[in-house]
Structures are given as structure tokens and as C-alpha cells.
Amino acid sequence: MDYRDAGVDIQAGRDFVNRIKALVQQTTRSEVLGGLGGFGGCFQLPEGYRQPVLVSGADGVGTKLKIAQALNQHHTIGIDLVAMCVNDVLTCGAEPLFFLDYLATGHLEPEALTDVIAGIAQGCQQAGCALLGGETAEMPGFYPVGEYDLAGFCVGIVEKAEMLNGSQVRMGDRAIGLASSGVHSNGYSLVRKIVDEFIGPAAREQSEAGATEALVSPWSITPWAEREDLPPVDRQQSLGAALLTPTQIYVKPVLAAQRSGLTLHGMAHITGGGLPENLPRCLGEGQSVQLDPQSWPAPPIFDWIASTGSVPTAAMFDTFNMGIGFVLIVPPDEVESALRWFNTQQCPAYGIGEVVAGAGEVLGLPG
């Protein structure tokens, strides 16, 4: 008996590393020292910093993985993984330098897992950081067939004097919301429960009544087919495709805006807990934010979730990003220039509120 008899194929692991080397190489930066395969990844700090501060972040993509696995579509979930980490690091004003991933599965499926790594590499390219290394763990008996889990780790850098920590935020500063691409990577346990309870049974009934075989999968429905206010491409999008839309990565447009002269007093990544939980994290003591929820459009997926699952509006805002994936706090006299900048960078931006006196709350939301 050997390790392979126990369910761990060492040669398959070696072959997998060789498959992904070219993907990793596409993300390299000049500061990377050495290649893939060492015991540790080495990275030389960029020059020009007087008091460099390293900023770290770790995250996953939650049960969005279940949808990717159900649809056998693995090429974008890696982008989500990178986005969740680099957007967090960005809120401190830091430039992401490098990224590491942890991928665990019961059995190595080379095609699917190569797609996952390709997505991670694409996310790193979007963020401008190097995929410095990672770990692929084959653990037979630990995960069901076809399932895997992901975790990501990112390190960024910022000048100490330029680090954002809430102390720069002033009363009267304005909140600028950067549009999300959809649900991003939070709230999927609620989404899956809604699909299981309300859409799955209906799809099965239609299939049993002689409808197309595709309707066996609730992810194939097109909830927006009758929405004449939407472009044709959106009306034709399936539920599964909408839910697998990758999380927006805000690193390059935000850092470029900052380097072009925009003053940023604070930033918030809108993840689990939505605006009410995440926006106060970038404020100072005695501050709240007054928002106008009518000042930005929400992607149609949120209307569908709310109506199909009878989810109260307050609960929607407490769970999802509701169309705003990242928030910037800027001085009032820079709002217009900031909006112009982001809207010319294919990063839709909206003036959504103002910093007011308070106890760390988000005011103005329904409920």
C-alpha cells in the first residue's frame, strides 16, 4: 500500500504545479525573488518608502463556491478570492504587493482547479499584485466529490504618514460610492436558501411537466427576461451567471485617483453586513454617515432576491452591498472631480451621503 492507495496522488500534485506555473508567471513583479516551488515566496520591498507599513488581509468567498461547483464553472471564483483580500487591504491606503492562496479538496481535478488558479492569476493582474505562492491540499474523505475550499492572503504597503485609519475624516466630508458588479461574495447562504425553497421546486415541476431539461437546474432561469428597462444582454442572463459575476476589484482606479491628487480621508469595502456594518469602520469617533439610498441604482439581482425571498428592505441592506461595493470619504470640494475621474475610468461612482455627528451609525437607510 502507498499514499496513492490512501487517496493522495503526489505525482498529480506535481503535474498540477507544472500546469499553473505559466499562470503564476503572468502576475510577477520586479520585486519577486525566485520562482514557484520554493518553501517560501520572497519579495523585496519597493524602494522609495521612508516609513513603510505592511498591511495584511485574509479572506475567502463563502458559499458562492457552492454555485460555482453546481454549475461546474470555476474560472471566475478565483477573481472573487483575490478581490475580497485586496479590496480590504486597499482601505488602509495600501497598494497590494503579493497574494497567496490555499486550495483544499478531496481529490485533485486538474481541469477545474487550473480554472480556479487562472481566475486567481487574473484577479492578481487586475490588482497589480504578484501571485507569490500557495498551497494545494488533497485531503481524501474530508470534502465531498467535486468540492473544494479556498482561502486567500494578501500583503500590501503604505507610507505610514499616508495610512488611513479614520482620524482624517471630518464632519461634512462626502461619501462616494463605487458601483458593485452584483452580489460580490457575501450573502450567498441566504441566496441559496431562497433558490432551494422557492425556485428549485418550481423548476422541477416544470421539468416533470415536459419543459426543457435545462429547467431541472434553477440556476438556468432568466428572471429578468420581461424587464424592458434592461439591455437585451442583461435580460438574457441566467440566474447562475448573474450570481457568479466576479467581485469588482477597485485597486487600480482608486490608487490612480489618489496618485492623481484626489484627497482620500477614508475607504470602506462593503462586504458581509452591507453598508450599515462596514461604512462605520472607516469613520472617526463621534461620526456617522447620512446616506441617500435613492442616489445610486441597484443591480436587478437585488430586486429579484428581495421579491422572491420576501426579504425586508432593511434585511437586504444588512446582508448585501445593494449596488455599492466600495466607499470613499472625500472633502466636499473634491466630490465633483472625484466623480468625473471614476466615471471616466469605467468605474461608475455616485455621491451617496455625508459625514455627520453621531455614534458610528449609517443613517437614512430603510428600516
UniProtKB/Swiss-Prot annotation:
It holds the Pfam family AIRS. HAMAP family: AIRS. PANTHER family: TRIFUNCTIONAL PURINE BIOSYNTHETIC PROTEIN ADENOSINE-3, TRIFUNCTIONAL PURINE BIOSYNTHETIC PROTEIN ADENOSINE-3-RELATED. Keywords: ATP-binding, Cytoplasm, Ligase, Nucleotide-binding, Purine biosynthesis. One of its GO terms (biological process) is 'de novo' IMP biosynthetic process. GO terms for molecular function: ATP binding; phosphoribosylamine-glycine ligase activity; phosphoribosylformylglycinamidine cyclo-ligase activity. InterPro entries: PurM-like_C_dom (IPR010918), PurM-like_C_sf (IPR036676), PurM-like_N (IPR016188), PurM-like_N_sf (IPR036921), PurM_cligase (IPR004733). It is an enzyme of class 6 (ligase). The keyword Nucleotide-binding applies. This is Phosphoribosylformylglycinamidine cyclo-ligase. Gene3D superfamilies: PurM-like C-terminal domain, PurM-like, N-terminal domain. The gene is purM. Coiled coil: none annotated. Its EC number is 6.3.3.1. Its main location: cytoplasm. It is found in: Cytoplasm. Pathway: Purine metabolism; IMP biosynthesis via de novo pathway; 5-amino-1-(5-phospho-D-ribosyl)imidazole from N(2)-formyl-N(1)-(5-phospho-D-ribosyl)glycinamide: step 2/2. Belongs to the AIR synthase family. GO terms for cellular component: cytosol. The lineage of its organism: Bacteria, Bacillati, Cyanobacteriota, Cyanophyceae, Gomontiellales. It comes from Cyanothece sp. (strain PCC 7425 / ATCC 29141). It catalyses: 2-formamido-N(1)-(5-O-phospho-beta-D-ribosyl)acetamidine + ATP = 5-amino-1-(5-phospho-beta-D-ribosyl)imidazole + ADP + phosphate + H(+).
